[in-house]
Amino acid sequence: LAADDLAEFQPEWMEPISTTYRGWTVYEVPPNTQGIAALMMLNILENFPIKDLGHNTADTLHLFIEAKKLAYADMLEQVGDPNLARIPVETMLSRKYAKARAAEIDTQKARCVVTPANLQHIAQLPGADTIYLTAADKDGNMVSLIQSIYLGFGSGLVAPGTGFVMHNRGGLFTMTEGKANTVGPRKRPLHTIIPGFLRRGETKITFGIMGGWNQAQAHAQFVSNVVDHGFNVQWALEAARFTKRSFDGCDVELETRIPERAIEGLRNRGHLVVTTSPFDSSVGNGQAILRDANGVLYAGSDARKDGSAVPANPMP
C-alpha cells in the first residue's frame, strides 16, 4: 500500500438498494456491503406467514435461520467491489428468485450445508468494533450512520500528524481466485457495516445494529418486529434475538429470553442451539428513531450496550 493508493481514492455518493416487505420499504447500502443480505432475507421471509406463526416461536426462528443461510451464501458468492465485479443486484432482489430460494427451505429440518467452503475463513475472523448513531431534527432530516475501523484499533497504524487509525478491512477479502471478493489492487472488500432506513408513507425509521456479520440478520429481525409484530422501536431493538456467526452448518446462538419450547423445537429440527444470556451483545446492539406522519419523534436504544436515546432541547 503506497501513498498514491490513498491519494487517488475518492468517496462516492451511492443510491441505496431497497425492497418492500409487507407494504414497508426497506433501504440498505448497496454492495460492497452486506446490506443486500438483509433485503434478501426479507424477500424470502415474505413467502411465509410470519405474523401468524408468532414472535420467536420455533416455526418463525427456523425460517429466519434458514433464510439467513441462503441469503448469506448468495452474498458471499456474488458481492465484491461493484466497480470491479458484475454484481447481479436486480436478480438477487427479485421476487422470483426469493420465491425459488424460499422453496428450498424444509420447514421441519435444518439445512447444514449451504455456503461454499472456500469462503468460510471470513466467518472465522474475530469480531469487530463498530459504532452506530442516528439523529433527526425538527426540519424532517434524519441520518443513519455507522462506522468502524474493523478489528480493535484497526491496522494499528496511525497516520503521522493526524491522530486517525487506518482500518484493516482488507482482512475480509478472499484469496480464492476468480471470486467477486478476491483480493486485488484498487479494490474494496465485501464488508459488514450497514445503516438502515425503513419507511411506509410518511412514517420513517432510521436504524442500525452493530455486530460484524450479525448486522444483516439482525436488521431482518428488527424489521420483522416492527412490521409483522407491531413493536415500537425500543421493543423491536430489545426483543430477544438469535445470531448465526458461521456461514454454514447448523449451529445457532439464542438469547435465554427465547422460550424453552422454541429452543426445543429448533433442536428437534436439527439446529445445534447454544444459549447465551438474556441480553447478549453477540446478537448485535442497535439504535433507532421513528418519525410518525405527524412529525412526532420516538427513539430507542438497545439495552445490550452503552448508549441512550437523547432528546435535545429546542434552541430559544
Residue positions per predicted region:
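Accessory "access/gating" subregions that flank catalytic or transport cores
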Residues: L1-N32, A102-V113, A117, I122-L125, ...
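Short, small/polar residue-rich loop motifs at catalytic or cofactor-binding pockets
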Residues: W13, G127-T130, H191-I193
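Glycine-rich phosphate/pyrophosphate-binding beta-alpha loops
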Residues: Y27-G35, I131-T134, I146-L157, I209-A216
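Alpha-helical support elements that line or immediately flank enzyme active sites
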Residues: I209-F231
